[in-house]
Amino acid sequence: IHATAHAVCVVLAAFGYWVAAPISLAFTTSGGVLGALYLRKRATGASRLAATHISRWLIVSVYVAAGLCYATIITH
């Protein structure tokens, strides 16, 4: 799902919809965080993802940053 959304945002950004660029960054960053947590889970043999609540807050902060980028783009 992350890859599809990322691809759509990249295509939209290529066609001049510049608001898609920060959203694409948000998808990429959240996917990277989830991937890192999954690898940590696999390496330690844990039964669930460690620090899931921290990863949720990281993902939320990335989306907030994307929203702030959008607000900056449309006001300038």
Swiss-Prot record:
Segments spanning the bilayer are 7-27, 54-74
What's the protein's topology in the membrane?
Answer: Multi-pass membrane protein
* Lineage of the organism: Viruses, Duplodnaviria, Heunggongvirae, Peploviricota, Herviviricetes
The identity of this protein, by name, is Membrane protein UL43 homolog
The subcellular localization recorded is: Membrane
Which superkingdom heads the taxonomic lineage of this protein's source?
Answer: Viruses
Instruction: Give me the Gene Ontology terms describing cellular component.
Output: membrane
Q: Which family does it belong to?
A: Belongs to the alphaherpesvirinae HHV-1 UL43 family.
Alphabetically list the UniProt keywords: Membrane, Transmembrane, Transmembrane helix
Query: Which species is listed as the source?
Result: Equine herpesvirus 4 (strain 1942)
Is this entry keyworded Membrane?
yes
Where mainly found?
A: membrane
